């Protein structure tokens, strides 16, 4: 008996008007994730995944390209308004927000959620070049 070919159902994309852009800007890379209000990820992009390797990965331009890519993916879900949460001290903090603004999103709120230790772990030793 021949097996019936099972067809995968076309996935219905939910429409979300308001989203949250989580920007994690480390010294080495920038990760941009756009979620809905509940925290379910809709789209994400990184500077490294956008084609930048090595020291170019940690530049503001690489963060800008990652934000543009993430913004294009989130447009498919109908996101129009973004609340921005920035974490980390990296060089891509400001350029990411500018790129999201230029991509046509209305930025409603910007929150700096950088984790600051209350004298927690010992920091890495200073570089001697």
Swiss-Prot record:
Q: Name one GO cellular component term.
A: ribonucleoprotein complex
For this protein, the record's SUPFAM superfamilies field holds: Translational machinery components
Single GO molecular function? rRNA binding
Ribonucleoprotein found in the keyword field: yes
Q: Does the keyword Membrane apply?
A: no
Biological-process GO terms, alphabetical: translation
Keywords of the record, alphabetical order, are: Ribonucleoprotein, Ribosomal protein, RNA-binding, rRNA-binding
Looking at the Swiss-Prot or TrEMBL record, what is one Pfam family this protein matches?
Answer: Ribosomal_S11
PANTHER family per record: 40S RIBOSOMAL PROTEIN S14/30S RIBOSOMAL PROTEIN S11
Q: How does it assemble?
A: Part of the 30S ribosomal subunit. Interacts with proteins S7 and S18. Binds to IF-3.
Q: What does this protein do?
A: Located on the platform of the 30S subunit, it bridges several disparate RNA helices of the 16S rRNA. Forms part of the Shine-Dalgarno cleft in the 70S ribosome.
Regarding protein family, the annotation reads: Belongs to the universal ribosomal protein uS11 family.
Protein name, as recorded: Small ribosomal subunit protein uS11
Q: Which organism was this protein described from? A: Aliivibrio fischeri (strain ATCC 700601 / ES114) (Vibrio fischeri)
